[in-house]
Design a protein with these regions (language model features):
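Juxtamembrane interface at the cytosolic side of transmembrane helices
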Residues: 2-13, 126-154
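Residue-identity detector for glycine
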Residues: 14-15, 21, 30, 48, ...
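Generic hydrophobic/packing signal
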Residues: 18, 22, 61, 67, ...
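Amphipathic coiled-coil alpha-helices
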Residues: 21, 87, 101-104, 131, ...
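Extracytoplasmic/periplasmic regions of membrane proteins
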Residues: 36-124
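N-terminal extramembrane/targeting module of integral membrane proteins
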Residues: 1-54
Length: 154
């Protein structure tokens, strides 16, 4: 049974780290491109009432986050500042066939739609973050692997 020298083991571990790091970077880049493409395909433009980036196409983490904020603010304003809980409480106190109940149900539906849209946009923001983290980790692995491969007997 032959044993590997410590230097040979370091070189092998370095090679594995470089391979793993390269894979992390490649997969992260692919994920970033996929998320960006899907956001672009939706053809969403940040509306004029956005605090920043109004008129820009939603295609990156910043524009997706700004769009989510705008949706939240518009939904709250459209519901008169009411939350789902407020609307549910109000619905219990009115006749189900009244105009007020219809309006409350419309507000509830609008809040629900807005929550769904915001969740989708914030999920893309999170996916961008995970992708960037994985790419950074991959780059670190490549650097460490390179240093391990350069190790010599001194």
């Amino acid at each position: 049974m032959t044993s590997l020298s410590p230097l040979s083991t370091l070189h092998r571990v370095g090679g594995l780290a470089i391979a793993a790091g390269s894979l992390f970077v490649a997969v992260s880049a692919g994920a970033w491109v996929t998320i960006t493409k899907q956001l672009r395909d939706e053809k969403i433009t940040v509306p004029g009432n956005a605090p920043v980036l109004a008129g820009k196409r939603v295609q990156d983490p910043v524009t997706a986050y700004v769009e989510a904020l705008v949706i939240k603010n518009n939904a709250e304003r459209g519901a008169g500042g009411r939350t789902f809980a407020d609307i549910s409480d109000a619905l219990r106190g009115v006749d189900a066939s009244s105009d007020e109940a219809r309006e409350l149900r419309n507000q509830s539906s609008a809040l629900s739609t807005a929550a769904s849209l915001r969740t989708s946009l914030l999920t893309s923001v999170l996916a961008y973050g995970v992708s960037a983290f994985a790419a950074g980790l991959g780059a670190f692995f490549v650097l460490v692997g390179t240093q391990l491969r350069r190790a010599d007997d001194k």
